[in-house]
Amino acid sequence: MSQANAATKASSDVFFNASLEDIDPEIFGAIRNELGRQRHEIELIASENIVSRAVLEAQGSILTNKYAEGYPGKRYYGGCQYVDVVEELAIERAKKLFGAEFANVQPNSGSQMNQAVFLALLQPGDTFMGLDLNSGGHLTHGSPVNMSGKWFNVVSYGVRKDDHLLDMDEVARLARENKPKLILAGGTAYSRIWDWKRFREIADEVGAYLMVDMAHIAGLVAGGQHPSPVPHAHVCTTTTHKSLRGPRGGMILTNDADIAKKINSAVFPGLQGGPLMHVIAGKAVAFAEALKPEFKLYAKNVVDNARALAEELKSHGLDIVSGGTDNHLMLVDLRPKNATGKRAEAALGRANITCNKNGIPFDPEKPFVTSGVRLGTPAGTTRGFGVAEFKEIGSLIAEVLDGLKVANSDEGNAAVEQAVKEKVIALTGRFPMYGYQG
């Protein structure tokens, strides 16, 4: 073997066999540190969850090497016979999980899935209705800073000021006055049950499509803990992470064959090129997990834990927007503790409790300050926390916020936060992740 060939072989051996730690210790170190953070912190961000090792393996597989523009059986590249199997499994499992006739599993994100529906069903300048961001909606539901708010005429609906519940009379009135082409239901910070039937009645009355973005509650729908929008909506979108516990990505469901064709064309070639086959594999695995009986117990535990956390926080003098929760999340009004969301997020973070600042309905504070935090139970429930643990977590949160109130500064109360941090590390140590003990 020549020196050149030997060098090429050695280089090839390194390329195919060397570990990440050997090739890129900086990235390896960042990932290792993030794993440590996840192991030793309590994750309360409502949109986050923890995937199984099987999902990690699928998403980190050699499927990342394969281009597969098009759909199963109709690809623009050769060599797709095995990725076709993967995508077909994902589609069939999604349809079974949600009782839908059609599923597109290619959207790369929640924003892109919603954009694809707009591309399929609307024209620039058309009117659609969506939940106001300040009432718990999403950027893609018509926020002026988002494409959805720039390309379309948006009419926003909201919650009532007295009880922070959806004002369905207002939805009906706005629909009659504005004759939208599409009504979008669903949100990112609404803790109560959605009345899909009433939304469909309003949509039918004005001749609008009903689109439901169930990204946050899809796992609860799949687990039987929230009414399904699929029988009522013309089209449903959902992310595949959050309460569904899969990889980060999106999905679109419908029971209408004509809409399905428009959706498929909007996703590809309208919005995306080659799908991420390794992510679709992860989606398929997560859907299979969600079809198992134990996922129904998981979904029930998510809701039970959220209610326990909300009640514990209320017992410590905090206000919960709308008075409580029917799903996986809650908005905590911090004003009784004279705290802002910005300060609370930072203080809780120093105590190893991760959450996000969040505006509350009719919030007097600026969006980057806020009067509230949003808390969710999917990740902690995946980890194994039950009602007892979430009551303890609620008490720890109150302890930090009380310390913050005494300190009355951005720096917080170091002694209280350190004491809580030690309790958090002890708690998380009892619920190891990915086979790790300690």
UniProtKB/Swiss-Prot annotation:
Keywords: Amino-acid biosynthesis, Cytoplasm, One-carbon metabolism, Pyridoxal phosphate, Transferase. Its cofactor is pyridoxal 5'-phosphate. Pfam families: SHMT. The keyword Amino-acid biosynthesis applies. Belongs to the SHMT family. The modification N6-(pyridoxal phosphate)lysine is found at residue 242. GO terms for biological process: glycine biosynthetic process from serine; tetrahydrofolate interconversion. This is Serine hydroxymethyltransferase. InterPro entries: PyrdxlP-dep_Trfase (IPR015424), PyrdxlP-dep_Trfase_major (IPR015421), PyrdxlP-dep_Trfase_small (IPR015422), Ser_HO-MeTrfase (IPR001085), Ser_HO-MeTrfase-like (IPR049943), Ser_HO-MeTrfase_PLP_BS (IPR019798), SHMT-like_dom (IPR039429). Its main location: cytoplasm. It catalyses: (6R)-5,10-methylene-5,6,7,8-tetrahydrofolate + glycine + H2O = (6S)-5,6,7,8-tetrahydrofolate + L-serine. GO terms for molecular function: glycine hydroxymethyltransferase activity; pyridoxal phosphate binding. Catalyzes the reversible interconversion of serine and glycine with tetrahydrofolate (THF) serving as the one-carbon carrier. This reaction serves as the major source of one-carbon groups required for the biosynthesis of purines, thymidylate, methionine, and other important biomolecules. Also exhibits THF-independent aldolase activity toward beta-hydroxyamino acids, producing glycine and aldehydes, via a retro-aldol mechanism. It comes from Brucella melitensis biotype 2 (strain ATCC 23457). Pathway: One-carbon metabolism; tetrahydrofolate interconversion; Amino-acid biosynthesis; glycine biosynthesis; glycine from L-serine: step 1/1. Homodimer. One of its GO terms (cellular component) is cytosol. (6S)-5,6,7,8-tetrahydrofolate binds at residues 133, 137-139. The record marks 241 as: Plays an important role in substrate specificity. It is found in: Cytoplasm. The keyword Amino-acid biosynthesis applies. Its EC number is 2.1.2.1.
